[in-house]
């Protein structure tokens, strides 16, 4: 949900003012923690082995780490030092890495995107207009503005800079509530090959029975 925005803002405060290697390490640690907690189901899916769980978490964490270094480098650009500039650069770089890991290597691993938990929030209404890319970008954009609104280490030229950042972040969250959701029925049809619902627990016992899951 929307708690992701302040969480990402806090994370951003750790990487946008440090060197590339430190940002890499910070995001690698963050990424490993995130993915190990997100995909423990891979242990059961691979027969109870921890190695695939750890390996997949590490590979995905590398993408986070690369983004950390990229963010650190982009913050050295003069036009990225403003609140709007940083928000734009950070949103584009994060979504770019997010889409990269969703398609690479092989067919990618499109889990853990910032857009997914926003389905029941006002930002979820942006999905029909730009898909997960737009939703993730707006989440990051809001997070940067929130981070800048509480960044007292910078000497802003105007007293209203921080309040304006905060108000803008709030507005970006609230405004999508005014967007209509199309309730009309779509034309055409789609064929679904298979639908897999929940399985009986314990999972390994269910998997061991041939045809019970896929039959």
Task: Name every feature range the model reports, one short phrase each.
Residues 1-183:
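Membrane-embedded alpha-helical bundles of multi-pass enzymes
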């Amino acid at each position: 949900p929307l708690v992701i925005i302040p969480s990402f803002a806090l994370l951003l405060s750790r990487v946008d003012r440090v060197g590339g290697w430190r940002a890499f390490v910070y995001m690698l640690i963050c990424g490993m923690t995130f993915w190990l907690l997100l995909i423990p189901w891979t242990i059961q899916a691979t027969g109870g082995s921890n190695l695939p769980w750890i390996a997949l978490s590490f590979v995905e964490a590398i993408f986070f780490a690369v983004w950390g270094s990229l963010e650190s480098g982009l913050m050295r650009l003069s036009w990225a030092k403003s609140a709007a500039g940083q928000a734009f650069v950070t949103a584009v770089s994060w979504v770019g890495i997010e889409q990269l890991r969703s398609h690479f290597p092989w067919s990618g691993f499109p889990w853990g995107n910032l857009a997914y938990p926003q389905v029941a929030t006002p930002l979820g209404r942006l999905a029909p207009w730009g898909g997960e890319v737009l939703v993730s970008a707006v989440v990051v954009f809001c997070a940067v503005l929130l981070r800048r609104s509480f960044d007292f280490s910078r000497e802003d030229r105007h007293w209203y800079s921080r309040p304006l950042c905060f108000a803008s972040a709030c507005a970006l969250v609230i405004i999508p509530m005014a967007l209509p959701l199309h309730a009309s029925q779509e034309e055409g049809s789609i064929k679904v090959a298979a639908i897999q619902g929940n399985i009986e627990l314990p999972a390994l016992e269910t998997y061991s029975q041939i045809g019970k899951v896929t039959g």
